[in-house]
Amino acid sequence: MSEEVPQQFPSSKRQLHPSLSSMKPPLVAPGEYHRFDAAETRGGGAVADQVVSDAIVIKSTLKRKTDLVNQIVEVNELNTGVLQTPVSGKGGKAKKTSRSAKSNKSGTLASGSNAGSPGNNFAQAGTCRYDSSLGLLTKKFINLIKQAEDGILDLNKAADTLEVQKRRIYDITNVLEGIGLIEKTLKNRIQWKGLDVSKPGETIESIANLQDEVQNLAAEEARLDDQIRESQERLTSLSEDENNKRLLFVTENDIKNLPCFQNKTLIAVKAPHGTTLEVPDPDEAGGYQRRYRIILRSTMGPIDVYLVSQFEESFEDIPQADEPSNVPDEPSNVPDVPSNLPSTSGLPENHDVSMPMKEESTERNMETQEVDDTQRVYSDIESHDFVDGIMKIVPPDLDMGVDYWFRSEVGEVSITDMWPDESGPDWNQMITFDQDHAGPSDNKILEQPQTPSSPTPEESTATRSPTGS
């Protein structure tokens, strides 16, 4: 039987049964096929031929199975060769394979892997690469920091624990140190200083604590809102009640008794929105006396100024009308004037030098005039018109267009001197008008601007003699 099979093997290709010519793969192993034919019950010759044909079919199937086994063995050898460590360059160069051979091997690998899941080999290769990635290594390194005592980690122990080279650990530490998350305490020792690294259980507890804190803050905010609403309702009822409107005021003593206003001059200003307030330096002029000024400017409406309280020593340095000036006399070319000439102003004989003046200085004359204006305002405040209570301060009727404070710092030249106004006010007429209505204390203030230059003896005699009669 075994000798006849090789002799008839070449003719088996022509004698294949029609049922075996189908391209569908067998459902079971070829050895398990069994045919029951009606010719089997007939003559023995027919049965022998059928057995021979069955034997031929089985032989061809066994050959295909053998080829499949050989392919599986080649696939296993290829897998083991890929995962092995590459040979060093000293041992010899590996044989170069063509691209077609590589493609055939890859195709064989894919066909052999179909016995299991389709992507097992690719998943294994990707998993191995991810295991050695820097991202996963960084996560493991952070976990080591969490588990370290006092947050200090030894890099040598970390390299041994993670089973990687130290240069990989140094790559991670350099990046974390660059962004300020860790710091080096000692050699090969690092400490976490960035965001709070807490354990999983601590994170859950912190979330619960934060939620409780948010609820407490919300309750506190609601309580404060209720208190604010109640206070606003009380203020509204207090201000809108007709019985309380007559009590909505403060007295002068209420203001003066405040500790912050003790021994101070208090001035109340009622001005519209956008009013500018300037307080020049009292020592800016550099004169022998200090001048205090408050400059208010508004383009939206009138300004009202009230004197609430006046400190007694506020104007102590200003010379009074009956006090001689302590300023030394300035040398001048004025000849001696007889002392027996009458003086109607009631001032001492040296009243001509009560205000220092220069003959050829327009700026000094303007400063003297402004000092006189300041003294006039002070004299008005100290006059008999000052009564108990709050007094309204009215500025003097002078030319408010005269520029004094807006002056140039270079050369001390004022803008008024640079552009003189020829059609300015006639000071002689203003002085004559003021002389008719001013008291004895105002004569001194008004007589000083009349001497911008050194007068001659004849002019002084002519000026004084009519008033002495």
From Swiss-Prot:
- Tissues expressed in: Expressed in proliferating cells and several differentiated tissues. Detected in inflorescence and shoot apical meristems, cotyledonary vascular tissues, leaf primordia, young leaves, base of trichomes, central cylinder and elongation zone of roots, lateral root primordia, flowers, pistils of immature flowers and pollen grains.
Give the protein name, as stated in the record.
Answer: Transcription factor E2FB
Tell me the domain of life.
Answer: Eukaryota
Question: According to the UniProt entry, which residue ranges have a biased composition of type Basic and acidic residues?
Answer: 349-374
Segments of this protein annotated with the region Leucine-zipper: 210-238
Per the entry, what this protein does is:
Transcription activator that binds DNA cooperatively with DP proteins through the E2 recognition site, 5'-TTTC[CG]CGC-3' found in the promoter region of a number of genes whose products are involved in cell cycle regulation or in DNA replication. The binding of retinoblastoma-related proteins represses transactivation. Involved in the control of cell-cycle progression from G1 to S phase and from G2 to M phase. Stimulates cell proliferation and delays differentiation. Represses cell enlargement and endoreduplication in auxin-free conditions.
Q: Which residues form the signal peptide?
A: none
Q: How is it modified after translation?
A: Phosphorylated.
Matching entries from InterPro entries are given as:
E2F, E2F-DP_heterodim, E2F_CC-MB, E2F_WHTH_DNA-bd_dom, WH-like_DNA-bd_sf, WH_DNA-bd_sf
Give residue spans, biased composition: Low complexity.
447-469
